[in-house]
Amino acid sequence: MSTAFLTLIAVIVCILFRILNVHSQPLKPSVWCLDAHFLDCLYKIAPVLREPYIPPRLWGFSGHVQTVLHSIVGRVRCPWPLGERVYMSLKDGSTLTYDLYQPLNEQEDDITVAICPGIANSSESVYIRTFVHLAQCNGYRCAVLNHIGALRSVQVTSTRIFTYGHTEDFAAMVEHLHQKYRQSRIVAVGFSLGGNLVTKYMGEDQKTKPDKVIGGISICQGYNAVEGTKWLLNWQNFRRFYLYIMTENVKSIILRHRHILLSDEVKARHNLNEREIIAAATLPELDEAYTRRVYNFPSTQELYKWSSSLFYFDTIKKPMIFINAKDDPLIPEDLLHPIKEYATTRQNTAYVEVAHGGHLGFYEGGFLYPNPVTWLDRTLVAMVGSLVMMHEVGKVAP
């Protein structure tokens, strides 16, 4: 066997070891929290936060592998919870749907978990189904917002789809749930884009929210779209590749409903160029060609600033828990500094940072094969319980 061949094998092995990050060890999550009472309640109901997160040994310490597996596989042996689809007609002519799942086990408290999925996702997304099933088994009712345009089986009936910052659809679902279950307390849970929407919704003081909304949980959001898009346009850490995938997902929804979203009347009204929309290779290009025009923003920078939850932190009145992974390839550490500062200066707020997990991955398991339920699923269910307990015992600071 030649020296050159052996050298090549050695280089490949070194690259694989570096990508898989196999030298890493399981670590306990880091928690930023000013409020001692809040933190005590969180640890009491979610003791998993005191324990090391142990991903699959071979590949689980790589944020890239976790992220790619999440986007391709989602979860293993995923259940398909049985629920009902609720249809709502909004004032702008949009057809909004959400899927409603009743608890499988009785609990003393009537709790509804209002779930906002990630970009272009819905109740049919595998990671959402896994979390819903686990929450049902723990006695929680779940409602999952289907982002307008995301479901192939539901036609778009107005000239818009979801965006990164418009919270009206989520607010409409929460209000409908409140009218339907008057005594139920509501915990809002958002994943990625949904985390931004939930946080922004909680901080929009000009919008009236039901008093039964007792808190929110945000997972894997970037907080600041203005700065976040700059990072995503960089090829470092393969971010430009991830941005391309997200762009194609949103673009495919627009083109799937082009007979309404890109009708001649709509294109004339908003000065849309269909060729520019089709040619867009990044979200900023797509938002310049489509989103900011449909919503009448003077620039994408204005759209991104208005959409970013970071600028609504100071007006959040209810308890919030934020979760991010340090190795999330979509969200660099620089974007996490503001949430750390916020959590250490505000009551009723906690920020949990996990060393590994990627973007919405957080798989657990042995050497190779992951468990059906992830660390994130288990932790979120416990966090919902901690918010409920804090509300009940009156430890939420005024």
Curated annotation (Swiss-Prot):
It comes from Drosophila melanogaster. Residues 23-398 are extracellular. Belongs to the AB hydrolase superfamily. AB hydrolase 4 family. The active site is at 192 (charge relay system), 328 (charge relay system), 359 (charge relay system). Residues 1-4 are cytoplasmic. It is a single-pass type II membrane protein. The keyword Transmembrane applies. The lineage of its organism: Eukaryota, Metazoa, Ecdysozoa, Arthropoda, Hexapoda. SUPFAM superfamilies: alpha/beta-Hydrolases (SSF53474). GO terms for cellular component: sperm flagellum; sperm plasma membrane. The keyword NADP does not apply. GO terms for biological process: acylglycerol catabolic process; lipid metabolic process; medium-chain fatty acid biosynthetic process; medium-chain fatty acid catabolic process; sperm capacitation; steroid hormone receptor signaling pathway. GO terms for molecular function: acetylesterase activity; lipase activity; monoacylglycerol lipase activity. Residues 113-365 form the AB hydrolase-1 domain. It is found in: Membrane. InterPro entries: AB_hydrolase_1, AB_hydrolase_4_CS, AB_hydrolase_4_sf, AB_hydrolase_fold, ABHD4. This is Abhydrolase domain-containing protein 2. It comes from the Eukaryota. It is an enzyme of class 3 (hydrolase). The chain crosses the membrane at residues 5-22. Keywords: Hydrolase, Membrane, Serine esterase, Signal-anchor, Transmembrane, Transmembrane helix. PANTHER family: ABHYDROLASE DOMAIN-CONTAINING PROTEIN (PTHR10794), MONOACYLGLYCEROL LIPASE ABHD2 (PTHR10794:SF45).
